[in-house]
Amino acid sequence: MAQNALRRRWKEGKAAVNGWLAIPSAFAAEVMAQCGWDSITVDLQHGVQDYISMVACFQAMHAYPVTRLVRVPWNEPGIIGKVLDGGAYGVICPMVNTKEQCEALVSACRYPPKGTRSNGPIRAGAYGSPGEYQKTANDEILVIPMIETREALDNLDAILDVPGIDGVYVGPGDLSFSLGMVPKLDREEPEVLQIYERLIRETNKRGLYAGIHCASPVYAGRMIRSGFRLVTIANDSGLLAKAARESVAGVWAEVGDFR
């Protein structure tokens, strides 16, 4: 298995900007891969993606220096093993709320003796000599549970102490929903920012990395300065819609009298 460039980047003390693929299109993935992202995540939870479209996106991105991640739809070992066999270099897993759930996630991502992942990297192991992938996969694949509920915050220390995770990823929408707020990104409430500060402090203490989903480049930059080491900006469909709306509005701003 080739080295995980995102893992190497983190070890060098650098942050990473992450793209997000909701559109089930190899061409969309290819276009995104040319845009300078350090990593790109295929979203199987809320994106319009399935396993076949995920593999097609991976194939389209293969020529570009982006680390390929997947957000799985749930903490289920069959799904997790399948996306890793398909070539994912990391798993972002939603709704990890307890130590036991986190341990199950790690086990599903790691080959024995560190875990229970079944051997069969049908695509991931297709490059290199037989057995080479299995020798390095445990050291290269990133395991990233999502922190997005009040229960996860209550169990944060226990989750972060689970051996084998590489960091955590904040889902601000579900987290704020769990805290009784309207779900949205780029929160400014002091109580939410205090939660982020705690996450950064506790991950740093353990040599782990914190990631967060953002809506805007400005907020993402703030999060990097505050200590997050993986920031996602919206997703491909959101970026497309934003650019399209701005283009249409820009035309009418120039010639509004013709409308």
Model-predicted segments: where are they?
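Expand to "…catalyze enediolate/carbanion chemistry for C-C bond making/breaking, isomerization
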Residues: M1-R259
